[in-house]
Amino acid sequence: SSNRYEGVNYVIADGEAGWVIHGTNEPEVVALTEGLNVISNRNLNDPRDERCQLAKRLLTLQKLDSPVKFLAVASKVFARSPSSPMRPSMVIRNKDRGTVSSTLIALGLKPRDAIYQFTSGAPDENSFEDYSPMLRDILSRGLREAKLQAATV
């Protein structure tokens, strides 16, 4: 083992701005740009990352005019398994590392529009499970608490 921490990426966003925090040995904050942003285990929208480029290509082939349609296509894109060494793949499966999970999130103006899907494990071998009710509950509770706090100030 190299004792090197591979890290994690956190996405923090609201209706006006968003950032990715690369939680590695040297954390870094990167602003989201308007439009499609893709991240794998490297930098946000990394032009050297074949998986980011593949995802951008596959996600822009058709008109994705709703969050539901986008997530339906994205779940298929992220489940693209390695079939040959020369074919790009979204899933990594090596001896020393690999895809451990995948998350799809869509946020709307209202909490009821939120969609949260997660798979523990590589998405080509595991189905995305829907955790939207949990996310909607968290968002609604936060909104209620913020309104209550604003009313008491």
Task: State each model region's role.
Residues S1-V153:
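N-terminal nucleophile
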